């Protein structure tokens, strides 16, 4: 066991334009090869497209999409007596948001379309409405957890 103290949680910084932590989390997840300015560009273009499509506050659409995709429970593989069980575990809010962002970006990358900003904006609008690939992924995870409810005591 380590004698060091526990590391304190780092608070996520907010982005320069919208002053929003969720936007910054999105930027950091979309980032590839250290090109942060390109990541910001993609996110801001996607937010503008959301504004044009919905004619509402794009940050509220973003919040609604992430809230809709955030899972409450997930399954974790746990080895017990030679066999591996999928054990349902509860997920904290920060980890849930991170998963939701990962699923949203994965679903938007798989979408057909012109560019990433267009695909991301479409996925976010769909997720806010309650449809789309990321929402399906969340429902799939919840079904998996419900199916393996019998193994919850292995936690």
Swiss-Prot record:
One of the primary rRNA binding proteins, it binds directly to 16S rRNA where it nucleates assembly of the head domain of the 30S subunit. This is Small ribosomal subunit protein uS7c. Pfam families: Ribosomal_S7 (PF00177). One of its GO terms (cellular component) is chloroplast. InterPro entries: Ribosomal_uS7, Ribosomal_uS7_bac/org-type, Ribosomal_uS7_CS, Ribosomal_uS7_dom, Ribosomal_uS7_dom_sf. Part of the 30S ribosomal subunit. The lineage of its organism: Eukaryota, Viridiplantae, Streptophyta, Embryophyta, Tracheophyta. NCBIfam families: rpsG_bact. It is found in: Plastid, Chloroplast.
